[in-house]
Amino acid sequence: MSKHYYIGLMSGTSMDGVDAVLVDFSDDKITLVDTHTEPLPSHLLSGLQRLCQSGSDEINRMGILDRSVGKLFAQAVEGLLTKSGVDRHQIMAIGSHGQTVRHMPNLELGFTLQIGDPNTIAALTGIDVIADFRRKDIALGGQGAPLVPAFHQQLFARTGHQRMILNIGGISNITYLPGDASAVIGFDNGPGNTLIDTWIKQVQGEAYDKDGAWAASGKTDEQLLKQMLSHSYFSLSAPKSTGRELFNQAWLEQQTSDFGYLHESDIQSTLLDLTCHSIANDCLKLTEKAELYVCGGGAFNTELLTRLAALLPGYQVHTTASLGVDPQWVEGIAFAWLAMRHKLGLPGNLPAVTGASRETVLGGLFPGN
């Protein structure tokens, strides 16, 4: 039987590189064939970080970065094809998430903006590109996020098993798979790695806290933790989504301004607990017991997993590796899956999750020829 090859491209709020995955959807199965990560050059990273905050000359900077990120995504495709040995003519489509630079769905005319020009990707690779996945959902009154719960349902749902799929990137999102006829629930629950990455970068110049070791060396300040958990976002009911617009360096500086006496590692520990407590609180609102499977960069933070397990004694805490899927690649596979759904004319959103008025085919087609 012929292979149904699709490529998924993802760069999340952590901005730590472009994940490229090659997936085969033949025989009604989801098979991860090969993977590649294209590093984000430091000049591009600093430009994107600047663009994520309001500033002067934004339109020019966005236009240039849109093309630059498109070229980087095309390089990721070329790297993946070279590594896999699969001919580009066998690829049915590329699903490109792009790089989010604004996500503001709750304005009167809500919007979300991902850059990484799909025309550039299509022109440089010669492969059809499906992109701009979020804005149709927003046009239908939804949040445009999270989009992965529909994929989590397809891949991980099992009758009789209550499962939580927890994706911890810069922002963390939860998918609750009840294991019966009840509707799937999913939402962004708050900061994942974004604040702990921001703080260690500011203090130590490191990109991330490996294994959560620095946080583990500190002591959480309960007063600061309580103050941060009082943020109105945490008490919002779903559907809800968030991003760097809320949880960023400016917010972190504002929150810690009265806590200058704390050791830097104590702040790191408190920020990690903010991630863990906000996740645990949301999980317990949904169910007292479940199987919890973690994916995304947070799945590799052993201190995070340890603290999460302690806060959720009724939960079995694992990574998606226990289900046979490497936690690093779950989101990339999801965007290959969304491209496949688009090609087949099938919906990609879950209105119960995003708040959209109906199911819809997501994304636009940018032909490679």
UniProtKB/Swiss-Prot annotation:
Its EC number is 2.7.1.170. Coiled coil: none annotated. GO terms for molecular function: ATP binding; kinase activity; phosphotransferase activity, alcohol group as acceptor. GO terms for biological process: 1,6-anhydro-N-acetyl-beta-muramic acid catabolic process; amino sugar metabolic process; peptidoglycan turnover. It catalyses: 1,6-anhydro-N-acetyl-beta-muramate + ATP + H2O = N-acetyl-D-muramate 6-phosphate + ADP + H(+). ATP binds at G12, T13, S14, M15, D16, G17, V18, D19. InterPro entries: Anhydro_N_Ac-Mur_kinase (IPR005338), ATPase_NBD (IPR043129). The keyword ATP-binding applies. Pathway: Amino-sugar metabolism; 1,6-anhydro-N-acetylmuramate degradation; Cell wall biogenesis; peptidoglycan recycling. It holds the Pfam family AnmK. Keywords: ATP-binding, Carbohydrate metabolism, Kinase, Nucleotide-binding, Transferase. Catalyzes the specific phosphorylation of 1,6-anhydro-N-acetylmuramic acid (anhMurNAc) with the simultaneous cleavage of the 1,6-anhydro ring, generating MurNAc-6-P. Is required for the utilization of anhMurNAc either imported from the medium or derived from its own cell wall murein, and thus plays a role in cell wall recycling. PANTHER family: ANHYDRO-N-ACETYLMURAMIC ACID KINASE. Belongs to the anhydro-N-acetylmuramic acid kinase family. This is Anhydro-N-acetylmuramic acid kinase. It comes from Shewanella loihica (strain ATCC BAA-1088 / PV-4). The lineage of its organism: Bacteria, Pseudomonadati, Pseudomonadota, Gammaproteobacteria, Alteromonadales. The gene is anmK.
